[in-house]
């Protein structure tokens, strides 16, 4: 169910800062037409930290409605307070989502045992599969392989999104967690190599603006056609790198606006729009990738 190129979907806003649900539906249709293998709603790229609880739940519910069972929908449910992640999980239990993606608690820097207990508490209240999400560059805490292996023994913890960029961990996680545990890259620049080493796919920022290329690349990779996949990967590499020239999702939201995928590139503070000096860099990356 969870494999291939999964998009970490943008949340489009109107100029007044309200969520643009018509724009959200347009994005969903773009991804389904392009062959995207799944959608993460209200993750980091979806600006989860600046949405209210009500907005968060509504964006997930609307995404499920718009997708209408055509591809899996994964809901972001991460927070740095366990009770908040538990609340999101309970609120979304009957939403029709296919899985939840929960980032490690950020800022408060829990121990490895604290991380284990955090995810265990979420798993105990959720009736949908759970995806662990490790991105120490944003959270200041690293979920190590040993607690991942303990968590993988729990019935509804089925996957890990690994955004460390440490490719050595693919084999470590596979050995510790078993063949049935799903490993997804959270780093576009190393995503293809991640699959070459035994991962099942990527949760991608680049996918927001190069959906067909990403879907094709990971389809080829999962078929073992790595040389063909690498040709696409090298063409997209300027995007993989320059979509992080400022904090994501700032660059990708600007790029999506330039491509007409969303009407407004508004972000909620403290995120601000892409610096003007970065416009030509991101535009050139899109040109080099053949999408602009």
Swiss-Prot record:
Q: What class of enzyme is it?
A: lyase
Kindly list the GO molecular function terms attached to this UniProt entry. Answer: 4-hydroxy-tetrahydrodipicolinate synthase activity
User: What biological process terms from GO does the record include?
Assistant: diaminopimelate biosynthetic process; lysine biosynthetic process via diaminopimelate
Q: Which InterPro entries match?
A: Aldolase_TIM (IPR013785), DapA (IPR005263), DapA-like (IPR002220), Schiff_base-form_aldolases_AS (IPR020625), Schiff_base-form_aldolases_CS (IPR020624)
Listed GO CC annotations: cytosol
Q: Where does this protein act, in terms of pathway? A: Amino-acid biosynthesis; L-lysine biosynthesis via DAP pathway; (S)-tetrahydrodipicolinate from L-aspartate: step 3/4
Pfam entry (one): DHDPS
- Hey, where's the site called Part of a proton relay during catalysis on this chain? 44, 107
EC number(s): the record gives: 4.3.3.7
What the entry lists under CDD domains is as follows:
DHDPS
Active-site residues, as the UniProt record annotates them:
133, 161
What this protein catalyses is: L-aspartate 4-semialdehyde + pyruvate = (2S,4S)-4-hydroxy-2,3,4,5-tetrahydrodipicolinate + H2O + H(+)
Where can this protein be found?
Cytoplasm
Q: List the disulfide bonds.
A: none
Q: Which UniProt keywords apply?
A: Amino-acid biosynthesis, Cytoplasm, Diaminopimelate biosynthesis, Lyase, Lysine biosynthesis, Schiff base
Q: What does the entry list as the binding residues for pyruvate?
A: 45, 203
What is the predominant subcellular site recorded for this chain? cytoplasm
Under the heading SUPFAM superfamilies, the entry gives:
Aldolase
Family designation: Belongs to the DapA family.
- How does the record describe its quaternary structure? Homotetramer; dimer of dimers.
- Please describe what this protein does: Catalyzes the condensation of (S)-aspartate-beta-semialdehyde [(S)-ASA] and pyruvate to 4-hydroxy-tetrahydrodipicolinate (HTPA).
Q: What protein name applies here?
A: 4-hydroxy-tetrahydrodipicolinate synthase
Q: Which gene encodes it?
A: dapA
């Amino acid at each position: 169910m969870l494999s291939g190129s999964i998009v970490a979907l943008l949340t489009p806003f109107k100029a007044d800062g309200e969520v643009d649900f018509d724009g959200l539906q347009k994005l969903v249709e773009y991804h389904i037409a392009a062959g995207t293998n799944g959608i993460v709603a209200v993750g980091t790229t979806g600006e989860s930290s600046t949405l209210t609880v009500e907005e968060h739940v509504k964006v997930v519910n609307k995404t499920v409605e718009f997708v209408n069972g055509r591809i899996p929908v994964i809901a972001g449910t991460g927070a740095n307070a366990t009770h908040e992640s538990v609340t999101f999980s309970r609120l979304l239990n009957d939403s029709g989502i296919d899985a939840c993606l929960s980032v490690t608690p950020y800022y408060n820097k829990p121990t490895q045992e604290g991380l284990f207990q955090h995810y265990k508490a979420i798993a105990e209240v959720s009736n949908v599969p759970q995806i662990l999400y490790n991105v120490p560059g944003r959270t200041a805490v690293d979920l190590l392989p040993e607690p991942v292996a303990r968590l993988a023994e729990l019935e509804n913890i089925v996957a890990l999104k690994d955004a460390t960029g440490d490719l050595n961990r693919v084999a470590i996680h596979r050995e510790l967690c078993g063949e049935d545990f799903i490993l997804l890259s959270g780093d576009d620049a190393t995503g293809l190599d991640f699959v070459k080493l035994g991962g099942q796919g990527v949760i991608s920022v680049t996918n927001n603006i190069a959906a067909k290329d990403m879907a094709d690349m990971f389809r080829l990779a999962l078929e073992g056609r790595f040389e063909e996949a690498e040709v696409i990967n090298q063409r997209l590499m300027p995007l993989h790198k320059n979509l992080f020239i400022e904090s994501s999702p700032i660059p990708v939201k600007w790029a999506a606006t330039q491509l007409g995928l969303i009407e407004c590139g508004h972000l909620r503070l403290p995120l601000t729009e892409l610096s003007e000096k970065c416009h030509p860099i991101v535009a050139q990356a899109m040109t080099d990738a053949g999408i602009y």
